[in-house]
Amino acid sequence: MYSVEDLLISHGYKLSRDPPASREDNPKGRQAARTGTRAGQGLQNGHEDGPAALAHRKTSAGKGHVSDSESRRSTPRGHGEPQSTSASRTSEAGFCNQPPSAWSSHPPTGNDQAYRRRGRQEARSQKPREHENLEARGMAQAHSLPVHVREGPWEVGGRSEHVMKKPVWEEELRMSGPAKWQNVSLESWNQPRKLGRQMSDGDGERLFQDLYPFIQGEHVLNSQNKGKSRSLPRVLSPESLSCTEIPIPLNERHSPKMPPYPPTCAPNLDSTRNSEKSGCSAPFPRPKFGRPLKPPSYSSHQQSRGGADSSDSQDSQQMDAYVPRHELCLSDPGLEPPVYVPPPSYRSPPQNIPNPYLEDTVPINVCGGHSQQQSPTEKAGASGQPPSGPPGTGNEYGVSPRLPQGLPAHPRPVTAYDGFVQYIPFDDPRLRHFKLAQPQGFCEDIKLDDKSYNSSPVTAQEPAHGGMQPDGAIWNPQSLIPPSGDERGLVLADSSPRWLWGQPPGDGENSGLPNQRDRCVARGQWPDVRGSQHGHTGRQVSSPYSQGESTCETQTKLKKFQTGTRTKKSSKKKMNETIFCLVSIPVKSESHLPDRDMDNNDLKPSADQKNGSDKSPALQEQSLLSMSSTDLELQALTGSMGGRTEFQKQDLGEPEEDRQTNDLSFIHLTKHRELKHSGSWPGHRYRDQQTQTSFSEEPQSSQLLPGAKLGGPSRAALSPKCSDPAASEAQTHTAFPTGDHKQRPSARNLKGHRSLSPSSNSAFSRTSLSVDQAPTPKAGRSQPCVDVHGLGAHPGPKREVVKGEPTGPCNSKQLFGQFLLKPVSRRPWDLISQLESFNKELQEEEESSSSSSSSSSSSEESEAEPQQENRAHCRQEDVGFRGNSPEMRVEPQPRMWVPESPVCRSGRGESKSESWSEELQPGHPRAWPPSPGRFRVEEGGGAPFCSADGSTSAEKRHLEVSNGMDELAGSPFPVTRMSSRSSDAKPLPASYPAEPREPQESPKITSAFSSVKPSEAVPRKFDSGGERGAGLPLSLSNKNRGLSAPDLRSVGLTPGQEQGASELEGSLGEASTIEIPPGESLQARAARILGIEVAVESLLPGIRRAGQNQPAEPDASACTPESPQEELLSRPAPADVPRVSTDAFYGRRKCGWTKSPLFVGDRDSARRAPQAFEHSDVDGVVTSTDPVPEPEPSPLESKFFEQKDVETKPPFRSTLFHFVERTPSVAGSEKRLRSPSKVIESLQEKLASPPRRADPDRLMRMKEVSSVSRMRVLSFRNADSQEDAEELKATTRGQAGLPGGLVSPGSGDRAQRLGHSLSVSKDSISREEKEHPAAQKEKSMDQDFWCPDSYDPSRVERV
């Protein structure tokens, strides 16, 4: 094939020089020696050694040329000690960077051992970073060691050159590294390849594969390495071509980059960096060749290490990592001779067409390292693809290179093309560890591509990407940041992790720590050396480095999405898994185009950034485009909700398509790309960057929160568009909910959303408050969580965003919840989104009033829940993604749940449970899922449902209280969080009392709802979990049932605290009632619970019936939207009804979600629940059921029911019993048939009757959408007809369980149904009782199991 000379050339060695030849010889000998030394490592030797050896050999060649090379050669492995000394800079710059590339391509192969060894050595110096990178990259250590080993020399001797080289290399990394590795690889290398080898990328890849054995394999390393002097002539041919192109660039670090890329580095890049491109095409051969490629990865690793070590080192490392990949050899020559020295000239000899941009970008970049890197990349790519320059370069090879390297703009397409292949491998690391950014790196590369894509192309394509251009500094920085900072630490691996995990604290997560740290460190340090060149510094430099973490967060969010995107591109399903983690954030960013844009901008710097402004409208539109007609309708209805929900859906559900466009906007990747490119993203993306940075754990929000807790301020600082993140994002995010968002986000923004707001749009901010509530402390990251989907929202924020999207008021919250949920089941979520839009609208006011407290709590929760949120988000996303699989969902849920629980407790309990709950519930879909009830909902899509549900505040709180109580029966945590959520006044006490009662309710509600919940909590979590995925559409149905169950639960919960029949009856769904004194008037209670004035009519049984009618459980879809809407309208207004409705809605969502799973659980639980309901309702005490969960609740329940009968709402109880008693007489089947339409009618009446502030038009439209969704759900249900029947059963059960409120006016239908259910229930009540303990145990087990899951950060990250 090609001799080592070729490899050297490709690596950037100027073989034309004699020293490079001898260098080649020396490095080859050295590499051969190293290979021999590491011969035992086999491929690892070949691969790991190959790139490392090449890096060393080329390093020596580049730096020491013969002397260093020979010295190194003398030291066969030398590994970085001699090499690092002499050729440390070169090796670090070029080969150390290249080996990381190689490692990127084959992290598990030789990389592992090699980097292990190297990492051991390297770890000494930069153990944390190294470890992080290793963790993030699984192969970073190999790079690390060489990099670090060389870092000493590099940093010391090569630091000057690094500084000089770094800008070029960095630019090359940005452009070349990301684009260069793909495009430079494609074009730069193609140029040499085409010029010298005339080989296409595929050919080049094959060449790599063929060559790799020679170059990196024992053949080249041993035979060719030593035997052959790397025939300079052969190398010279490509080198000449490359050098010809690069001679000046080499001077400017471009030619080194270019030639190295073309001959070896480019192939390496293609091989490794191109792993994105060729992905698994040449895993081993490529890894072999990836050896040289490894250096980029190594550079990334080094960057992450270097960021810690020193800005310069990191810059040089990053640049080296990327640029040196290509220009290691040339770089070495550059280092050796003055050729490389002139960075400015480097710009001048731009063989890339985007050079002008790059040049501009380079100038833009202070160090120009990043910009120059981009420029070189673009130059190289432009040289190869002159037209590709700004758009093409940024886009085409940007994607390809950016994917591999840092080119953000173009990697997306190329990434999709090439990255998919390799993304899976990287995805695996990425999936297992978000911060293992290799796959995420690629994912991030895509995102970075998008980011860097816009960034790098912004540098390179600043003209091309106007939208990005506005963020040029930010864009460039972001793109530069991801490639430079992210790629530096883990361009491939770290980059993504850094963005994805950058959220924790930049490198808060160990996984992404290297990147994040690198990024943060690099960010902090890079700004010095490469503040401008560093994308991060460039852009984050724009935004305070204090927000560096935010930027990191942004990157983190990007990373997360990138992970998802990368995964999506490589493995869409994998992406889905990742997406769910990402989904939360994408929801906001994508759903809330502005927010998400901010976050997504963060995530998809370029595409998203451009989308930034578009994203909300255009992205939503695009989201609608991708959405089904109903989804579109819903989106139109809810404004951004549909889009955000779509984002969620697409993010979680349609990761594949999205993946191409925006890693962050998985679903909307393509759409988002267009939108992203529209230019809204510059600010938003940056805003989201901060948000997104913590998006995994929602540190972004948190980080943003510090500076940008005001919604826009920090974000504004971050980006212009972010200036009014809450209002602007909310508004932009959801034109529809803009007003609401503005209202709500204003308060919320400032309080809880201030961080979220900055993080994402107001919708998210609203939702982010909810979502960010957990992440609010990590508000910056929260929206990152939420909008960047807040990725943090990812757990909750995204959900919230989605939730918020349906309605302006609801948008924020709902968007998040929805986003998360959407992926699981779009229809129910759509409906829920609309319903939540209503709820949000209604709750918006409530939240407006409680926004401050809510924000406060949101902040609190955010703080408490940053990781939890992330986990919850991941979990939620997992629920969304894995919601399809019960286990996954169950596992994710619990993980989220436990984390959420404390958050919920702290934030939600503290904040007005209601407003906070509302917010959090959307955002706390994550928290909710953590809550067993939440989990269920989330599992079944209920959490997002809950989130999406505007009523989530009361309802979710109720459900959280009830569900939480249900789960509390299984686990105290849920109670806490239920109490937090459910209790305005009865924070934990109520919850805990509710907990005993919940156990009782677990029998009663659990028998009915919790029976479905505890009994079915397990089935739902497991059985239902499985069904939930399938039954997500049924979640509306379940939602109906959830209404019953929620009401029941509210009853149970309410009784838990208040144990007052009034609560059970009056506010079945009003968990708050528990805390409320029984004497408190319904209206007062409603006002207190809802935090808004409630019309008395709303509180009346009729209104409750609206809430109950929402239980048109068979009509979960239509009913749910309307019921929830109506419920929202009526329920938010009346504390009691809203409470009941909300709880019922949440429960319905929950139960609806559980419903489909409940169909599993309903099958066991439907009887159980009706029986339990009968027991609780007919018997007035969940005696039979009660004993199952906990005897002590039985008294409570007994008392509760007695109170229900006697104490507080005798009328309700009377009605309840009437309905319960009457139910049997009513034709259950007829009622069932009629319940959907009837419920819809009821809801329509209700919605129209007390105009709960919901737009009548909107309500009508929502009803329409609901009908469509219901049809869809029914279609789903047709497949699940049994589930449907059981759903009705569950509805009946729910009615029986929630007789008071549910059986109210609308209870007739429900009561009839309930009667049917009750009759069935009586039959199976004994069975239910018998089953219930097991179910309860199951639930407890589930909770216990979930708890660990919810706390399992590894899993969250992994997912």
Curated annotation (Swiss-Prot):
Superkingdom, natural source: Eukaryota
Modification type Phosphoserine: residues: 1044, 1050, 1194, 1281
InterPro entries: JCAD
Record-level GO cellular component terms: adherens junction; perinuclear region of cytoplasm; ruffle membrane
Biased composition (Low complexity): 302-321, 849-859
GO BP of this protein: cell adhesion; positive regulation of blood vessel endothelial cell proliferation involved in sprouting angiogenesis; positive regulation of cell migration involved in sprouting angiogenesis; positive regulation of MAPK cascade; positive regulation of sprouting angiogenesis; positive regulation of vascular endothelial growth factor signaling pathway
Residue spans of biased composition, Basic and acidic residues class: 15-28, 120-135, 591-613, 868-880, 1324-1342
Keywords carried by this UniProt record: Cell adhesion, Cell junction, Phosphoprotein
Pfam families: JCAD
Protein localization: Cell junction, Adherens junction
Compositional bias ranges of the Polar residues kind: 82-91, 98-112, 539-554, 619-632, 689-704, 756-773, 1003-1013
Region (Disordered): 1-147, 249-411, 454-554, 591-813, 840-1076, 1105-1141, 1157-1207, 1225-1260, 1276-1359
Segments of skewed composition (Pro residues): 335-353
The protein's name in its UniProt record: Junctional cadherin 5-associated protein
Gene expressing this chain: JCAD
